[in-house]
């Protein structure tokens, strides 16, 4: 073989090798240290690290939604309200390591110095958009503001935030999976109940809804997503007409006038509701209390609405209101399935130990 031919073969081999290296690197071009341009919920264009390794999440719901993406190991500090041994939110129970992490300041935004001390690559902020921009300006750390919407009228907003989290952490498939799963459950609930005629639906009410603290029987959320999902006859919507899910407190006289046949109450506030009934004897005449049709739900909110609990509550409500349409559903099993999907671990039983749910409660004794 001539030297020229040997040289040609070597040259060709080098070209093939270089091309292969280029193709391989091209298929995995998003390496650690890469950045991606995103637009957050406040409309801010931000360059953020792709799949950051050190993350702080502050504000209502921020940490919860990151846990839906199995990002616990990336969290390097938590707000003070996320620490302690008396926490029973679904994501806290499924990720006990969180309470052992260093504090980054109070709830609703944390403290700048404590956040910076944890050297995060990225901050997820869900409190105030102005505070998010200010935090980025003062720290030089990318801060992404998200809002997370809710499961009813602002569901698409929550889905878009999931998609953004998926983009940042290279978990687009997980975001799509969560969106599809959520929509499938809501569709299933609606399909089971859409043909039930109004005169066959009992009058229902839900009370004891927490909002920036615990509240008694007159605290409601309207529209109440679980009721809407199962097309329930919610007496509160006879008088309260809100476009978005809104927490409000009604007058005692209003509840007495509505006189619901069935009442669902937030299990985290049963003690307050019992106090209400003891303090105001007129409540004892309500049809729901007289017939024993008062049932407990998983806590609706704890530092923002609890996605899995809301969906699980809807199935339990459906089972109580329309047993034939939900004959194949065992509510506790469904709740465990839902929490395991969102958090990787079924936590109903652990929540239930603290806040007994999916059961009748006697408010008269």
Listing of model-derived features with the role each one plays in the protein:
Residues 104-107, 112-125, 251-268:
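Proline-aspartate-enriched helix->loop->beta-strand connector
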């Amino acid at each position: 073989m001539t030297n020229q031919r040997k040289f040609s073969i070597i040259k060709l081999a080098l070209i093939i090798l270089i091309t292969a290296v280029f193709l391989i690197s091209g298929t995995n071009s998003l390496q650690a240290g890469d950045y991606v341009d995103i637009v957050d919920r406040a409309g801010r264009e931000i360059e953020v690290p792709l799949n950051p390794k050190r993350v702080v999440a502050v504000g209502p719901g921020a940490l919860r939604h990151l846990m839906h993406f199995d990002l616990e190991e990336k969290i390097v500090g938590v707000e003070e309200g996320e620490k302690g041994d008396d926490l029973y939110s679904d994501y806290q129970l499924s990720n006990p390591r969180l309470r052992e992490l260093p504090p980054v300041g109070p709830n609703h935004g944390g403290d700048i110095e404590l956040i910076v001390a944890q050297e995060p690559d990225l901050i997820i902020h869900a409190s105030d958009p102005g505070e998010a921009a200010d935090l980025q300006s003062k720290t030089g750390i990318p801060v992404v503001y998200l809002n997370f919407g809710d499961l009813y009228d602002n569901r698409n907003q929550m889905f878009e935030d999931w998609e953004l989290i998926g983009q940042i952490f290279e978990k687009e498939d997980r975001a799509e999976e969560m969106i599809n799963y959520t929509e499938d459950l809501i569709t299933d609930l609606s399909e089971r109940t859409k043909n039930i005629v109004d005169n066959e639906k009992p009058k229902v009410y839900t009370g004891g809804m927490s909002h920036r603290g615990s509240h008694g029987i007159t605290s409601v959320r309207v529209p109440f997503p679980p009721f809407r999902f199962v097309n329930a006859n919610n007496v509160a919507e006879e008088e309260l007409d809100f476009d978005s899910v809104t927490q409000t407190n009604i007058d005692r006289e209003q509840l007495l006038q509505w006189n619901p046949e069935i009442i669902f109450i937030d299990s985290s506030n049963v003690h307050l509701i019992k106090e209400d009934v003891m303090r105001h004897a007129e409540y004892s005449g309500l049809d729901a209390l007289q017939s024993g049709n008062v049932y407990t739900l998983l806590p609706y909110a704890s530092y923002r609405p609890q996605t899995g609990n809301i969906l699980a509550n809807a199935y339990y409500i459906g089972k109580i209101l329309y047993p034939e349409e939900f004959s194949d559903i065992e509510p506790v099993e469904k709740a465990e399935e839902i929490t395991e999907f969102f958090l990787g671990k079924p936590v109903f039983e652990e929540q239930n130990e603290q806040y007994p749910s999916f059961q009748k409660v006697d408010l008269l004794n």
